[in-house]
């Protein structure tokens, strides 16, 4: 498979995030991965993923995907003390794409905060399961 030029970042290696990131790796993307529990991210290193130690290590990617449990969790990984935005040393991803299912108000707040930094935010909650993802049939509803 030809290597794709875009650098992708991924936050969240749960039952949905892992197979979603794995499909990007199979498609030839350069994917850097962070998960709160590092051991959940490590299996993707064997498939070509780069497991990073800090969220701020994802600040240099082109597109950052996330899929976490709550809006509070998402704000923490983006804007928390050691988040992608606050912990960075330099640039930011051009686009943040969140695949979590969170409150509309949380998405709106995040979009506003990122827009102030000149960054685009796409809310893209997904519907399906790991089997659907592996078959390439995941559904997403995008806004932003």
Model-derived regions: residue spans:
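Active-site-adjacent beta-strand anchor residues
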Residues: 34, 67, 100, 142-143
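Short alpha-helix boundary/capping motifs
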Residues: 52, 72-73, 142-143
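NAD(P)+-binding Rossmann beta1-loop-alpha1 motif at the extreme N-terminus of oxidoreductases
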Residues: 1-66, 94-95, 130-133
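Short, glycine/charged-enriched secondary-structure capping and boundary segments
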Residues: 23-26, 46-48, 78-82, 110-114, ...
């Amino acid at each position: 498979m030809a290597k794709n030029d875009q650098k992708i970042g991924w936050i969240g290696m749960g039952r949905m995030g892992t197979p979603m990131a794995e499909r990007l790796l199979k498609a030839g993307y350069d994917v850097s991965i962070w998960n709160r529990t590092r051991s959940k991210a490590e299996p993707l290193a064997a498939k070509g993923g780069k497991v990073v130690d800090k969220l701020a290590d994802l600040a240099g990617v082109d597109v950052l995907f996330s899929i976490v449990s709550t809006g509070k969790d998402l704000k923490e990984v983006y804007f928390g003390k050691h988040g992608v935005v606050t912990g960075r040393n330099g640039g930011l991803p051009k686009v943040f794409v969140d695949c979590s299912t969170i409150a509309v108000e949380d998405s709106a707040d995040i979009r506003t905060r990122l827009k102030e930094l000149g960054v685009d935010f796409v809310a893209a909650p997904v519907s399906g399961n790991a089997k659907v993802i592996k078959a390439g049939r995941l559904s997403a509803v995008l806004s932003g």
